[in-house]
């Protein structure tokens, strides 16, 4: 065994994990490369965009900035662990509100939304937008994301029925002009959809550009 590797033990999405890792490995890389949890995305790799957001002992953190050895003996929750029995209310609200577009920022946004509603059951629009400040979205202008969190808030507080989340095709069968569920929205909201950097295959080669 490589003498430079260190042993870590942690719990990820409720499951105990024991691995030997390089001390310099970041938590985001550990989740993606060692555990194949591709829902944790890497965007800026500098702690700015929030696509790599996870919960560490219940606190929202950017996993690209945290050495995995700092997470030793911690409990980690990723997007894959949010909806343990299918999609969570928050994930379903993102789909319903049209907050899932390209989907790359979606897992991090849902992790942030989960934290917001866990810490305050009645956040207003101003607080929601402020608390999303660490997560960047290129597509939506945040309007649909805020609407999704407001919808989840109302459902979780029983101010609105979860029945509104059911996907309904208009009686006419015509969908033009109607809001319907995107065909890949569930995969994006669950963090399961593969992007280029998520794809792996046996004996795959890696190229590093040197300038």
Q: What spans do the regions from the language model cover?
A:
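Signature of N-terminal electron-transfer/Fe-S-associated modules in redox systems
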Residues: 1-164
């Amino acid at each position: 065994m490589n003498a430079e590797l260190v042993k870590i033990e942690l719990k990820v999405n409720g499951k105990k994990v024991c691995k030997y890792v390089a001390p310099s490995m970041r938590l985001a890389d550990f989740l993606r490369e060692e555990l194949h949890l591709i829902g944790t995305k890497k965007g800026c790799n500098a702690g700015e965009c929030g696509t790599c957001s996870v919960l560490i002992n219940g606190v929202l953190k950017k996993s690209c900035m945290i050495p995995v050895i700092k997470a030793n003996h911690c409990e980690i929750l990723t997007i894959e662990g949010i909806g343990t029995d299918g999609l969570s209310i928050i994930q379903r609200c993102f789909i319903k509100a049209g907050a899932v577009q390209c989907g790359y920022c979606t897992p991090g946004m849902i992790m942030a939304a989960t934290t917001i509603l866990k810490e305050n059951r009645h956040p207003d629009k101003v607080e929601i937008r402020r608390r999303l400040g660490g997560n960047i979205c290129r597509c939506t202008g945040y309007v649909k994301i805020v609407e999704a969190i407001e919808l989840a808030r109302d459902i979780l507080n029983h101010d609105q029925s979860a029945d509104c989340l059911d996907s309904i095709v208009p009686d006419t069968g015509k969908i033009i002009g109607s809001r319907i569920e995107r065909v890949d929205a569930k995969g994006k909201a669950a963090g399961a959809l593969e992007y280029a950097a998520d794809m792996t295959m046996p004996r795959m080669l890696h190229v590093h550009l040197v300038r």
